[in-house]
Swiss-Prot record:
Name of protein: Non-structural glycoprotein 4
Organism: Rotavirus A (strain RVA/Human/United States/M/1976/G3P[X]) (RV-A)
Subcellular location: Host rough endoplasmic reticulum membrane; Host membrane, Host caveola; Secreted
InterPro entries xrefs: Rotavirus_NSP4 (IPR002107)
Family to which this protein belongs: Belongs to the rotavirus NSP4 family.
Length: 175
C-alpha cells in the first residue's frame, strides 16, 4: 500500500515507461510518440489512483459492488473524455435519480395547472353570476303597489267630506 501512494515510486515508473518507449521507438521524429506517451501516462495514473481508492472504499463501504461499479464508470467516462467523446456512461442509479427528479417536477406542474384551472373555473362562475344579475329583464306591467309613495294615496272621492286633509286650515305667520 505504501508503494502505491509513494510519489517517488510513481515518478520512477513514469521515467521507466518513457525510457522504455524511447528505446523501443528509435526514430525521434515519430509524430505519434507524444500522444502514446500521454495516453500511457494517463492510464498509469488512473491505475495508480484507482487501486488504492478502490481498496480503501471496499474496506470502508458495505456495498462493494456499487463502489466497483462507480469506479469503473468514472474510469470509462475519463477515457471517453480523453478520446474526445461528449457522451458519458451512466449507471442505473443516476438514471433513476434523474427520472425521479423529472417526475417530481411534472407532479409539481400538474398541481399548479390544477390550482390554476380551479381558480379559472371559479372566476368564470363568478362572472356568470354577475352577468345574470346585470341582465335587464323586460317587464310587461309595472307593479306600482310596492312603491313607497303610492301606499296611502286617496283620491278626491275617497276623502272624507271632499277636502284635502293635507292642506293647512289656518295660515300662521311668525312676527
Amino acid at each position: 500500500m505504501d508503494k502505491l501512494a509513494d510519489l517517488n515510486y510513481t515518478l520512477s515508473v513514469i521515467t521507466l515507461m518513457n525510457d522504455t518507449l524511447h528505446s523501443i521507438i528509435q526514430d525521434p521524429g515519430m509524430a505519434y510518440f507524444p500522444y502514446i506517451a500521454s495516453v500511457l501516462t494517463v492510464l498509469f495514473t488512473l491505475h495508480k489512483a484507482s487501486i488504492p481508492t478502490m481498496k480503501i472504499a471496499l474496506k470502508t463501504s458495505k456495498c462493494s459492488y456499487k463502489v466497483i461499479k462507480c469506479c469503473i464508470v468514472t474510469i470509462i467516462n475519463t477515457l471517453l473524455k480523453l478520446a474526445g467523446y461528449k457522451e458519458q456512461v451512466t449507471t442505473k442509479d443516476e438514471i433513476e435519480q434523474q427520472m425521479d427528479r423529472i417526475i417530481k417536477e411534472m407532479r409539481r406542474q400538474l398541481e399548479m395547472i390544477d390550482k390554476l384551472t380551479t381558480r379559472e373555473i371559479e372566476q368564470v362562475e363568478l362572472l356568470k353570476r354577475i352577468h345574470d344579475n346585470l341582465i335587464i329583464k323586460p317587464v310587461d306591467v309595472i307593479d306600482m303597489s310596492k312603491e313607497f309613495n303610492q301606499k296611502n294615496i286617496k283620491t278626491l272621492d275617497e276623502w272624507e267630506s271632499g277636502k284635502n286633509p293635507y292642506e293647512p286650515l289656518e295660515v300662521t305667520a311668525s312676527m
